[in-house]
Curated annotation (Swiss-Prot):
It holds the Pfam family Ldh_1_C. InterPro entries: L-lactate/malate_DH, L-lactate_DH, L-lactate_DH_AS, Lactate/malate_DH_C, Lactate/malate_DH_N, Lactate_DH/Glyco_Ohase_4_C, NAD(P)-bd_dom_sf. Beta-D-fructose 1,6-bisphosphate binds at residues 150, 165. The modification Phosphotyrosine is found at residue 214. It catalyses: (S)-lactate + NAD(+) = pyruvate + NADH + H(+). It comes from Synechococcus sp. (strain JA-3-3Ab). Substrate binds at residues 79, 85, 117-120, 145-148, 223. This is L-lactate dehydrogenase.
Length: 306
């Protein structure tokens, strides 16, 4: 399987590293407008190939992406300290107006995985610019937020986070929604998991999830490692046809009477991209929060100068 990464910044290279050590692809092309930096990053990466299963990795132009099964887009303006993901939108839309049509010339049959922020808006923009079926364009969405949620809950409950079922849906950003009503371990609801469990912890955990990116950016300038691992998981689901349930961002199709936007819901991800959406039964409060998140995204989309 062949993949391409567009953008050799911290996120793009974290994705490349994660996929290399997990033997996700047979071939990986990485492209960036800064050729010297790109070549340095690729040199550093390929020198580690003797330690893992062989993968062909090389620095290429957009034309070299031809034949890719999946194209991972991480290119775009960097989020500044204190800047929301939605503040980025107008700068990144201008980049995508030329990037997506150029990619479509070379790999129209690829699955497009958007990671650039604000990821929900940029996924929608990519879908409209590419003119592809909805399932063929998806975003990393709240895969990372869901992982953060599970990690923090698992820390409090003393369990392996992989054994905990919990989801963050909606926008990958300030209006994201924690689906508390569905948090469980082996079918046991969160309220029954521990006699010491304090409901006051709930808001504290969610605030940590929602503010995690801001805290990391304030301390080190960018997030990279965890999103790299999350993207590798999505790509594995795509190229290995795992039909894995992941909270990726994709076009709404009438779920919960939401407006037309791209946002995250639990979705089955396989070789064809997003194969279907799993509509959870939400509480009235969760449904209202999800609608608020969708309308915030719709307002941003409506402000775009196409």
């Amino acid at each position: 399987m062949k993949g391409s990464i567009i953008g050799a910044g911290q996120v793009g290279m974290a994705c490349a590293y994660a996929m290399l050590i997990q033997n996700t692809l047979d071939e990986l092309v990485i492209h960036d407008i800064d050729r010297a930096k790109l070549e340095g990053e690729v040199m550093d990466l390929v020198h580690g190939i003797p330690f893992v299963e062989p993968t062909r990795i090389w620095a290429g132009e957009l034309a070299d992406c031809a034949g890719s099964d999946v194209v991972i887009v991480t290119a775009g303006a960097k989020q500044r300290p204190g800047e929301t993901r939605l503040d980025l939108v107008h700068r990144n839309v201008e980049i995508f107006k030329s990037l997506i049509p150029a990619l479509m010339e070379h790999c129209p049959s690829a699955i497009f995985l958007v990671v650039s922020n604000p990821v929900d808006v940029m996924t929608y923009v990519s879908l409209k610019l590419a003119g592809l079926p909805a399932g063929q364009v998806l975003g990393s969405g709240t895969v990372l937020d869901t992982a953060r949620f599970r990690y923090l809950l698992a820390q409090r409950l003393g369990v392996d986070p992989r054994s905990l079922h919990a989801y963050i849906i909606g926008e990958h950003g300030d209006s994201e929604v924690a689906v508390w009503s569905k948090v469980n371990i082996a079918g046991t609801p969160i309220g029954q998991l521990s006699p010491e469990w304090d409901p006051a912890h709930l808001g504290d955990i969610f605030e940590q999830v929602r503010n995690a990116a801001y805290e990391i950016i304030r301390r080190k300038g960018a997030t990279s490692y965890a999103i790299g691992l999350g993207v590798a998981q999505i790509v594995q689901a795509l190229v290995r046809d795992q039909r894995r349930v992941l909270t990726v961002s994709s076009l709404t199709q009438g779920e919960y009477d939401l407006p037309e936007v791209c946002l995250s819901l639990p979705r089955v991800v396989g070789r064809q991209g997003v194969e279907r959406t799993l509509a959870m039964s939400l509480t009235e409060s969760e449904r209202q929060q999800l609608h608020r998140s969708a309308h915030i995204l719709r307002q941003v989309i409506d402000s775009i100068r196409w």
